[in-house]
Amino acid sequence: MAIQHRDPRGGGGSRDARTNRRIKAREVRVIGAEGEQLGVLPIDQALARAQELGMDLVEVSPMAKPPVCKIMDYGRFKYLEKKKQNEAKKKQVVVQLKEVKLRPRTEEHDYDTKIKKVREFLAEANKARITVMFRGREMSHRELGQKVLQRVIEDLRDVAVIESAPRMEGRQMFMILAPNPKMLQSQRDKAKAAAAAAPAAAPAAPAAGAPAPAPAPAAPAPAPAAADPAAQR
């Protein structure tokens, strides 16, 4: 019974909700376990109602006059709330900042490989920091770094948006790209469509107790060959 799960302070509650004997008001407006309005009751009578059902009296609106309380299984309520929070956390997308480093004169094959990586990062809803590293005299040719970053922007225009424009920081020129919202929405739409199509593609199972389909009729046996008159002589 829920009434057995109260803490030593006089009621199974938490800091955000008073329960049972922790409720300080002398009278409260009570909502029943099924959501029915029970009216304004003295606190002892409200507690008795909850105890009769093996449930808790929970103060859900302490600032009301009088406070509003609801009869519920508070232990189960807290369990379900925590379960919902855990499920929500699992669904949350944790955005990470991934970095890809380039040079002012990056070889074509290396460039293509790294652009492919950036596409993967963005498709996973992560952000990407594109950094151009300068060495020695390359610092006097910063326009090469700008050309590299501009090329990246053009090559990723379909999947990325600029979150932080190119800028210098020491011997590095970098920018930050974020996933294009249209691309992410398109991915979600495709996933929903695939999920909806999956059950339809599966063959329907026969209903329980339904007779098995009749076997296809066998092919007729071939007619015997006519005797050769020459062979009979």
Swiss-Prot record:
Regions of compositional bias (Low complexity) in chain numbering: 193-211, 224-233
Underlying gene: infC
Keywords: Cytoplasm, Initiation factor, Protein biosynthesis
Subunit architecture: Monomer.
Statement: the UniProt record of this protein carries the keyword Ligase: no
Gene Ontology MF terms: ribosome binding; translation initiation factor activity
InterPro entries cross-referenced by the UniProt entry: T_IF-3_C_sf, T_IF-3_N_sf, Translation_initiation_fac_3, Translation_initiation_fac_3_C, Translation_initiation_fac_3_N
SUPFAM superfamilies recorded: Translation initiation factor IF3, C-terminal domain (SSF55200), Translation initiation factor IF3, N-terminal domain (SSF54364)
Name of the molecule in the record: Translation initiation factor IF-3
Job description of the protein: IF-3 binds to the 30S ribosomal subunit and shifts the equilibrium between 70S ribosomes and their 50S and 30S subunits in favor of the free subunits, thus enhancing the availability of 30S subunits on which protein synthesis initiation begins.
Subcellular location field: Cytoplasm
